[in-house]
Amino acid sequence: MILIAVISLGAIGAVGAVFLYAASKKFEVYEDPRIAQVQEVLPGANCGGCGYPGCAGFAGACVKADSLDGLLCPVGGGPVMAKVATILGKEAGTAEPMVAVVRCNGTCQARPRTNSYDGTKSCAIASTLYGGETNCSFGCLGYGDCVNACAFDAIHINPATGIAEVDEEKCTSCGACVKACPKNIIELRKKGPKSRRIYVSCVNKDKGAAARKACANACIGCGKCAKECPFEAITVTNNVAYIDYTKCRLCRKCVAVCPTGACLLYTSPSPRD
């Protein structure tokens, strides 16, 4: 009886093994071995700055793509993309390097505090309760949700201005700070030649007089910048100007005519102590 039981169990196990083997072959998902090779040369930050869900997703996209144009690992940059191109036997793609930009210049001097917030130091929480400690309900709250979201120590709150500042040497344009900001004042913009760019450092949609009363550096929607721009790179919508970085040629005419200094020529972040 024992022998029969052993033989029966062995037969059942053998049949089960055959079925499992057949199923594994039938439902096997093939993965191109080059994906693992590409993933090995990537930094492994899994920041999502490339637009894909982690380094594995980006590696898969590189392998499947006919061309590497438009594909860029923001952490590794050109050197890493050159390695990827070598592995895949493709030409290294071209992609404009991006950087996070804080579109607020409401410093402590330009945007005086009118009240004091003693709640949890979180921009997300504070923004659900009220507009902030100043008369501008659009600007940087300065509680550092973007700082906490950044995995690269690339953004900090300047204690002198109360505004978030980006260290572009560390910024990988992963977009974590953009998602963390409840005021939507942080955006990814083209780094520009020699890390120079012009942007409107304000998102206040109030009418000119109200915006100027809340902050001395506010955009008042006067439209002088748009009229002066020879490249049609500037539009004024909802009382605030916006510069299309794909059209801007850094002629600086908008900077010269802006009455409040909202149009900024950005060169490099202020050094931190």
PLM regions and their residue ranges:
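Feature marks short, highly hydrophobic, charge-poor N-terminal signal-anchor/signal peptide-like helices
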Residues: M1-S8
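Transmembrane alpha-helical segments of multi-pass membrane transport proteins and ion-pumping complexes
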Residues: G13-Y21, A180
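Aromatic-capped interface at the extracytoplasmic side
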Residues: Y21-D32
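Membrane-cytosol interface motif
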Residues: R34-N46
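Iron-sulfur (Fe-S) cluster-binding segments and ferredoxin-like electron-carrier domains
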Residues: V38-V41, Y52-L88, L264
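Iron-sulfur cluster-binding cysteine motifs and their immediate structural context
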Residues: P53-F58, N115, A124, N135, ...
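Fe-S ferredoxin-like electron-transfer domains
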Residues: L71-N148, F152-A164, K191-A209
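Conserved small/polar residues in nucleotide/adenosyl-binding loops
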Residues: Y266-D273
